[in-house]
C-alpha cells in the first residue's frame, strides 16, 4: 500500500460490481480500515477518488485510499445474462473490464504526500442523463449522454477547453 500500513490509512472508499459489494468486503476484510462501500459500476473509480479527496481536503483524513474492482463475469451476471445461459452476443456489444485499481491520497504538505507529482484540484460529479436506451448489450450507449454532460460541465466549471 504505497509503503504504508493499514493504520496509516484513515478511510477506504471502495466498490465493485457484485451484489452487496462482496468482492470489496472480502478483499479488504483483513485490513481493518474503515470502509465506505460504493456501488457505481463504471463510476466507482471516479466516485471513490472524489470522495477520498473530499475527506482529505476537509481534514477528515490525512491519508485515504480509493479502490475499485470489476470483473467481466460479474457484469454479465448482474446486468445482462449469466455466462452459463450461453446467449449469443451481438458483435457490437460492449464488454466490462476485469481489473482493479487503487489510489492513496494524502493531504498536501503531509509526510505521506512527499514526492507526489499528482494532485486533485477539483472534481465534477455527474448526474443521471437518460435518453431511454434499454439495450443491456450496449451499456456504453446508455452511459454516453451522462459522460458527455459531465465532460462539458468539467470544462465549463474549470474554465478549460477541449484540446
Walk through the language-model features, giving the residues of each.
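Structural signature of cysteine-dependent C-C bond-forming condensing enzymes
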Residues: 2-11, 58-68, 113, 157, ...
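Stable alpha-helical structural segments in soluble proteins, enriched in small hydrophobic residues
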Residues: 1-4, 44, 52, 146, ...
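Glycine-rich anion/phosphate-binding loop at the beta-strand->alpha-helix junction
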Residues: 43, 58-72, 78-84, 89-90
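Active-site-proximal alpha-helical scaffold in enzymes
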Residues: 39-66, 105, 145
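Conserved beta-ketoacyl condensing-enzyme motif
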Residues: 1-43, 162
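Acidic-glycine-rich active-site phosphate/pyrophosphate-binding loop
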Residues: 15-31, 70, 74-81, 109-125, ...
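Solvent-exposed alpha-helices and their adjacent loops that cap or buttress functional pockets
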Residues: 5, 27-30, 44, 56-60, ...
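Condensing-enzyme catalytic core mediating Claisen C-C bond formation in acyl metabolism
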Residues: 82-153, 157-163
